[in-house]
Amino acid sequence: WPPLHPLYRTDLSLEAAIEEEANRLDPLVQQANLLIDTAALSTHELAERLREFLSGHSDKELKIVVESFGFKYGIPLDADYVFDVRFLPNPHWNQGLRPLTGLDDEVANS
């Protein structure tokens, strides 16, 4: 099974955990300069949106590196921006992609 929501507890349902997350994030949402609905975006489309927002245009002059890491090991030292993207589909949970790595085209393009 995929990992549970970070706020999920035995005394808090998944639905309540998601609502609690929304409540906790609301102050950030109120101050955000940009909100992106990622429900239908691929990682490539997300990178394009971020590139356009950060540089003012979608030309590929701005390089965006998407790197996976575990918070328990700390944020990568060379990161300028860090986004929590646990909401994106994880290829590990797709049986056809599980044996592959991010270097494989099937994973990179999913």
Swiss-Prot record:
Q: Which GO terms describe its molecular function?
A: ATP binding; GTP binding
Q: Which domain of life is it from?
A: Bacteria
Q: Does the keyword Membrane apply?
A: no
Family annotation (InterPro entries): RapZ-like (IPR005337), RapZ-like_N (IPR053930), RapZ_C (IPR053931)
Q: Which UniProt keywords apply?
A: ATP-binding, GTP-binding, Nucleotide-binding
Q: Which Pfam families match?
A: PapZ_C (PF22740), RapZ-like_N (PF03668)
Role noted for this protein: Displays ATPase and GTPase activities.
PANTHER family of this UniProt entry?
Answer: RNASE ADAPTER PROTEIN RAPZ (PTHR30448:SF0)
Family listed: Belongs to the RapZ-like family.
The name this protein carries in UniProt is: Nucleotide-binding protein HI1146 homolog
Top-down, what is the taxonomic lineage of the species of origin?
Bacteria, Pseudomonadati, Pseudomonadota, Gammaproteobacteria, Pasteurellales
